[in-house]
Regions:
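Short pre-active-site segment immediately N-terminal to the catalytic Zn-binding motif
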Residues: 98-115, 137-139
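Active-site metal-coordination segments of metallo-dependent hydrolases
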Residues: 42-50, 135-148
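Catalytic Zn2+-binding segment of zinc metalloproteases
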Residues: 118-134
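N-terminal export leaders
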Residues: 1-2
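Auxiliary, metal-adjacent structural segments of Zn-dependent hydrolase domains
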Residues: 43-93, 98, 153-161, 167
Length: 167
């Protein structure tokens, strides 16, 4: 999600960073995420494309797939998604239950990226926006590791699903 901006943060927070600063950074990130989510919704979001939905169904729960919305591109003003897409290597960014993709092609065809970002949606469901932001500031590598692992497992599962095999 925000790995493209991870160069600005340590992979794991160092003990020399005061806990109060980490708390402040977590609060600031949560505000940026919520603001970007609201802006994306105001700009217009869509349900998961039907072909992508069908491919994800069976690995991800239907309730999750029905809830998630997506859009393409960042906002026009200075924002977290704009920074992630312009100055980082982010292909997508997850803002609660809204996924912003850098371009339409990624949204239409990159199922592994969808699996990665849906994992972040599930993390938001477990932790809330503030909890997600706090964890991301303190251990972005750990947050991303779960999403990468899920995406890898999904990619391995996808070719087998038609044969009746399941995990």
């Amino acid at each position: 999600m925000l790995a493209g901006l991870a160069w600005a943060l340590p992979a794991r927070a160092q003990p020399a960073i005061a806990p109060g600063l980490l708390d402040y950074a977590g609060t600031a990130l949560a505000r940026l995420i919520e603001g970007a989510r609201q802006q994306a919704i105001a700009d217009g979001v869509r349900p998961i494309p039907p072909g992508v939905y069908r491919a994800l169904l069976g690995y991800f729960p239907p309730a999750l797939l029905h809830r998630v919305r997506f859009a393409v591109g960042g906002t026009r003003r200075l924002s977290l998604p704009m920074l992630a897409f312009s100055y980082g290597d982010a292909k997508a960014i997850t803002l609660g239950d809204v996924i912003l993709f850098k371009n339409e092609q990624l949204a239409d065809s990159n199922l592994k990226l969808w699996a990665h970002e849906l994992t972040h949606v599930m993390q938001y469901q477990r932790w809330g926006i503030m909890g997600f932001a706090e964890r991301y500031v303190r251990d972005s590598a750990g947050v991303e590791h779960e999403a990468v692992d899920t995406a890898d497992r999904f990619a391995a599962w996808l070719p087998r699903r038609g044969s009746g095999a399941s995990d």
